[in-house]
Amino acid sequence: MALEAAFSMSFCSFSVPKAIFCERETSSFQRITSRAKGIAGESQVQSSDGVETQVKETSPKVFDKLPERNLDTWSGGRETARGLSGSVVRNTVRKDTTLRHISPSSHSTKVRGDKPEISGGEKKAIVDRSKAYVKLKSLGKEVRDAGYVPETKYVLHDIDEEAKEKALMHHSERLAIAFGIINTPPGTTIRVMKNLRICGDCHNFIKILSSIEDREIIVRDNKRFHHFRDGNCSCGDYW
């Protein structure tokens, strides 16, 4: 499967004598890439050299271009991916934010009434983060015992498998959920906001966790609300 982008059009070709054309617009591009990955797998999705030509013109936020950057990364073009991100930042396109905390990926969860606690990519702003890490490690063991297997394909860094599994476990939405669990009564609904699309591995992890903890866990990413309950998600595993 190939995914190619020209100056003003996006083209998606499948192994059938049909092609899908759509206007070159960020949200539709994201939907096409997401569905293509779901059908064929990341390794079968490739980008053309023209993907990055409209970065500055078409994207108001750096994270709108993550699907294109990731296409380069999945295709082995890590240097191209890094250059794409750098180009966006140099041209004053700002990273997305959640509340007042700016980080590569931000989350907020409310505990103790209306007091917001923030966690982000650097994990510096979360209160009692050491306790949250301990709890997350414990939750990881429970989820593994329940059948969870890390999907390391979602880690785009060129590191070994063990490091990839550790990187997945430290995704900040998991830390935010662990923080919520230790600071709320059993059975309480946990709500987390995330400014990036949740990865497939975290999605699977939270599904299993919702069943183990017997809680509803609501995650709002940049696409939709995910209501996790009893091992299932409201999105039906397609988002």
UniProtKB/Swiss-Prot annotation:
Stretches for region Type DYW motif: 145-239
Gene inactivation effect: No visible phenotype under normal growth conditions, but the mutant plants lack editing of the ndhD-1 site.
InterPro entries on file: DYW_dom (IPR032867)
Protein name: Pentatricopeptide repeat-containing protein DWY1, chloroplastic
Alphabetized UniProt keyword annotations: Chloroplast, Metal-binding, mRNA processing, Plastid, Transit peptide, Zinc
Sequence segments annotated as region (Disordered): 40-59, 101-122
Note accompanying the cofactor annotation: Binds 2 zinc ions per subunit.
Family: Belongs to the PPR family. PCMP-H subfamily.
Function (record text): Plays a major role in single RNA editing events in chloroplasts. Acts as a site-recognition transacting factor involved in the edition of the site 1 of ndhD (ndhD-1 site corresponding to cytidine-2), which is a plastid-encoded subunit of the NADH-plastoquinone oxidoreductase. The interaction with CRR4 is required for its function in editing the ndhD-1 site.
Annotated GO CC locations: chloroplast; plastid
GO BP, sorted A to Z: chloroplast mRNA modification; chloroplast RNA modification; mRNA processing
Ranges of Basic and acidic residues composition bias in the record: 111-122
GO molecular function: zinc ion binding
Transit peptide as recorded in UniProt: 1-35
Chain segments annotated as coiled-coil in the UniProt record: none
Subunit structure: Interacts with CRR4.
Record's keyword annotation contains Transit peptide: yes
Anything else known: Unlike other RNA editing factors, DYW1 does not contain identifiable PPR repeats but does contain E(+) and DYW motifs. Therefore its association with CCR4, which lacks E(+) and DYW motifs, but does contain PPR repeats, is required for its function in RNA editing.
Renumbered residue ranges of the record's region Type E(+) motif: 113-144
Localization of this protein: Plastid, Chloroplast
Cofactor(s), names only, from the UniProt record: Zn(2+)
